Regions:
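RNA/tRNA-interacting regions in translation and RNA-turnover enzymes
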Residues: 1-317
């Protein structure tokens, strides 16, 4: 089996079944380039408008340069909520369908769950797609996984008890043609009965940075798009302080392609809302560069609040 075939197999389980053999962190660390190999779900629902990703940076200077490159344009920011992205389709004011992000073009129909979280009717006569994030409060351990896992539940009766904990927070409505700015768009979404990234108390939900957008939608659209993201938006992620634990062991995992990758086995530690016990080590050179030994203390972060990574050895005092 080729490496790409193996990635597609894992992708199918991750996107469609919610039964991936990898944790979210391992998935993101090892398969961040999935879109590059062209994965498409075997079946599903096509979004009326693609749900694109965002270009991301951890560098304040890069963010400042990006804002400066659009001199004269107002840039608005909003929290980047960390949940499960979903598009909602309405036609003539009636709820039609809800679809998970999937690969950005095709997702899975979750209408039987989302109908409990969004308005059944809205005061708008045309067909529109409303994009947003299903989130769970930070008081729930692994809130991001809880939100995504809830949408993967097969039966309505299993989902309904979770409705009081879950919330759909809208951040986009398309087509944009009749809306002049993101500020107006978000206000209009609120008037239709939706919580938005501007109205919700983001301190109650997990976030992984900020989203910056050029407010004028006509100008934003003229910046164009890559195959991955719009050029008129930029996500800024804050590198948070790490947590100290100890290196218990190193496991060597051999992939189907024969590539051997070291994985750190850690003393379990909470980082944000997630219990972390494993982290990628990339290769032997990385282990030697950090001077790691079994039993030593290490500082661990979750890059972008997702990927567990050892950043340094911590010497005992």
């Amino acid at each position: 089996m080729s490496e790409n075939t193996n990635k597609n197999s894992i992708a199918k389980e991750y996107y469609e079944g919610g039964n991936s053999p990898l944790t979210d962190a391992e998935w993101d660390a090892l398969y961040e380039g999935l879109e590059g190999i062209g994965y498409t779900p075997d079946s599903g629902v096509r979004h009326s408008f693609p749900m694109m990703s965002l270009k991301k940076t951890f560098d304040e200077d890069e963010l400042g340069s990006w804002i400066a490159s659009h001199e004269g344009q107002e840039v608005i920011s909003s929290p980047k909520l960390d949940g499960s992205a979903v598009s909602i389709l309405y036609d003539k004011g009636e709820f039609v369908r809800a679809t998970t992000r999937g690969n950005g073009k095709i997702g899975i129909d979750v209408s039987n769950k989302m109908k409990f979280l969004v308005p059944e009717k809205i005061n708008f006569a045309k067909k529109v797609q409303i994009d947003g994030e299903v989130v769970a409060p930070i008081t729930i351990p692994n809130a991001r996984n809880y939100a995504a896992g809830s949408l993967n539940l097969k039966l309505e009766r299993d989902f309904i008890p979770r409705c009081n904990e879950l919330r759909f927070v809208a951040y986009d409505l398309r087509p944009h043609g009749f809306i002049e700015s993101w500020s107006v768009l978000l206000n209009w979404l609120e008037s239709l009965g939706f919580s938005t990234v501007h109205s919700v108390d983001s301190s109650q939900y997990p976030t992984d940075g900020e989203v910056h957008r050029i407010d004028n939608i006509e100008y934003w659209t003229k910046q164009g798009f890559t195959s991955h993201h719009p050029r008129g938006s930029l996500a800024f992620k804050i590198q948070k302080e790490g947590v100290v634990t100890y290196l218990s062991n190193v496991e060597w995992q051999t992939g189907k392609s024969g590539v051997v990758t070291p994985v750190a086995i850690l003393g379990p530690v909470m980082i944000g809302d997630a219990l972390v016990s494993r982290a990628t080590l990339h290769n032997m050179a990385h282990i030697e560069e950090l001077g790691l030994e079994i039993g030593c203390n290490v500082e661990v972060i979750r890059s972008g609040e997702i990927i567990p990574r050892i950043v340094r050895r911590v010497e005992e005092k």
